[in-house]
Structure formats: C-alpha cells, structure tokens
C-alpha cells in the first residue's frame, strides 16, 4: 500500500466535478408538454434537490455549513450548499458572550467547499421533444474527493445523456517544499463508475492529463420507446408514429451527446 504524502500545512488542491445530466421525453400535445414541465417542477423541486445534495455531502464525508435553495417561475430550481471537511461543532469561544475577533486576525476558510444544482426544463413546441437538464457542481478543497458522488448522482436522475468534467487546480506542498498538483492517481472518470453503470452507457473520453482535466460523455445504450413517452403518447401512437417518434428522440439524443446539430 502506498504511504500517505506528508503535507506542509493544509491541502490546497481544489477538485471540481461537474455534471450535465439530460432526460429526454416525447410529449405530443401542448397540454402534455405543459404537464411534463409541471411534473418536472414537482419531482425535482428545491426541496427534493436539497435532499439529494444532502446525501451527496454524507457520501463524500463532508459537513454542511449553509443551504440556500430557490424554486423559480415558471420553471426550474436551484440549490447551493456550502460544506466543510471539519465537523461543524461550535467552540466555547464561539458561543460565549465576548467580543468577536479583530479583522486582522480573521483567517480565511481554506477548507470550505460547495455543491450546487440547477434545473432547466425545455420543450420544442413543434417537434414535441422535451428535455430536462440538471447541472451539478461538486467542488471540494482538501482531501475530500467529489468522485465518490459519481454513481449516486447518475442514478438519482433519469440520466439518458451525461457529460462529466473533473479537474484539479492549485497545488499543495509536502514537508520538503515540493509542489504537488494532484494528490491521487486517475486516468479516466470511467474508473470511478460501477460496473452496471459502465455496461449501461456508451462512453467517450477526452482527457488532458498534463492539465489534470478529465472529460467523459455517456449515452444510454438501451432504448425502449415507452420509457420516453409522456401523456397521451403512451397509448395513442400508431406503429408508424412510434417509428417516427423513435427516430426523432434518438436524433435528439445524438445531437446532445455530440454537442452539435446533425442532419435529419
């Protein structure tokens, strides 16, 4: 087993894991499209997102300092959680009746990190394609690794397409004064995914190792049209219409996966 790196002072590395998760569906009528947006707003409102992120904090072994959440009109929600590596237990000096510290002796909180989530429901009014995007950022300073939250977050949402970015920034020093720009081995984000997740998705990597920058795109392999239908479309489509919708939904997924418009 590798011996632990002995650091001089605090681990100043910042590790950031960013997700873009997409859920795709087909809603045929304007009424169904509006119902889909309302469903998403209810299913992934600020309260539910707060519960999910609170579990993420537990998974990565951090402690919650503060939570800010907001539901938006007409749609969408956001949650931001400020976290810390250290347990949030007030010291006697923090709760006793005494003057606070002077400005010149206040220390910067270098171990503070954060988790944010934003939701973006969107509908194509003509084609009937509805997309729900979730943006999640898990940024940690110190020894906590946001990669521990990878599998949990993918399974918490109906993830048809996922783009994941992981980067390490800053440096920390060992006791001999040498800089270390990363404190763990990694050659692919895929190595942090469970076997069932790797089997379920087609994945592509774009990694810039010398910049400690890692990128993985994921597209769900198994396509069952019934999983993508919402409202009347679940029962009212003819065989020909189902074939057309299948082509339309798959085309939408490929455009999002490759991040470019593609010919129909």
Swiss-Prot record:
SUPFAM superfamilies: S-adenosylmethionine decarboxylase (SSF56276)
Record GO biological process: spermidine biosynthetic process
GO MF entry, a single one: adenosylmethionine decarboxylase activity
Key words, A-Z: Autocatalytic cleavage, Decarboxylase, Lyase, Polyamine biosynthesis, Pyruvate, S-adenosyl-L-methionine, Schiff base, Spermidine biosynthesis, Zymogen
Modified residues (Pyruvic acid (Ser)): 113
A single cellular component GO annotation: cytosol
Keyword Ligase appears in the UniProt entry: no
Pfam families, A to Z: AdoMet_dc
Necessary cofactors: pyruvate
Catalytic activity: S-adenosyl-L-methionine + H(+) = S-adenosyl 3-(methylsulfanyl)propylamine + CO2
UniProt EC number: 4.1.1.50
Record-marked site positions (Cleavage (non-hydrolytic)): 112-113
Matches recorded under PANTHER family: S-ADENOSYLMETHIONINE DECARBOXYLASE PROENZYME
Quaternary organization: Heterooctamer of four alpha and four beta chains arranged as a tetramer of alpha/beta heterodimers.
Role: Catalyzes the decarboxylation of S-adenosylmethionine to S-adenosylmethioninamine (dcAdoMet), the propylamine donor required for the synthesis of the polyamines spermine and spermidine from the diamine putrescine.
Listed name of the protein: S-adenosylmethionine decarboxylase proenzyme
Gene name of the record: speD
């Amino acid at each position: 087993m590798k011996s632990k790196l002995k650091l001089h002072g605090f681990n100043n590395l910042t590790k950031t894991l960013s997700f873009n998760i997409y859920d795709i569906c087909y809603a045929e009528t304007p009424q169904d499209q509006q119902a889909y947006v309302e469903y998403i707003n209810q299913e992934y409102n600020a309260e539910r997102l707060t519960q999910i992120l609170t579990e993420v904090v537990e998974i990565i072994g951090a402690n919650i300092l503060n939570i800010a959440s907001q539901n938006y009109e007409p749609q969408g929600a956001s949650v931001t959680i400020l976290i810390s590596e250290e347990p949030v237990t007030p010291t006697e000096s923090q709760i006793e009746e005494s003057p606070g510290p002077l400005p010149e002796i206040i220390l910067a909180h270098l171990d503070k990190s954060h988790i944010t989530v934003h939701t973006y429901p969107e509908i194509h009014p003509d084609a009937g394609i509805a997309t729900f995007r979730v943006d999640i950022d898990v940024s940690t300073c110190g020894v906590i690794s946001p990669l521990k939250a990878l599998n949990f977050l993918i399974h918490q949402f109906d993830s048809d397409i996922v783009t994941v970015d992981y980067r390490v920034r800053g440096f920390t020093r060992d006791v001999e004064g040498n800089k270390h720009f990363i404190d763990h081995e990694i050659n692919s984000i895929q190595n942090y995914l469970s076997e069932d997740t790797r089997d379920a998705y087609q994945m592509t990597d774009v990694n810039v190792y010398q910049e400690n920058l890692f990128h993985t795109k994921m597209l769900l392999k198994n396509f069952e049209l019934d999983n993508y239908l919402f409202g009347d479309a679940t029962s009212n489509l003819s065989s020909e219409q189902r074939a057309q919708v299948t082509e339309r939904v798959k085309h939408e997924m490929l455009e999002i996966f490759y991040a470019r418009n593609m010919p129909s």
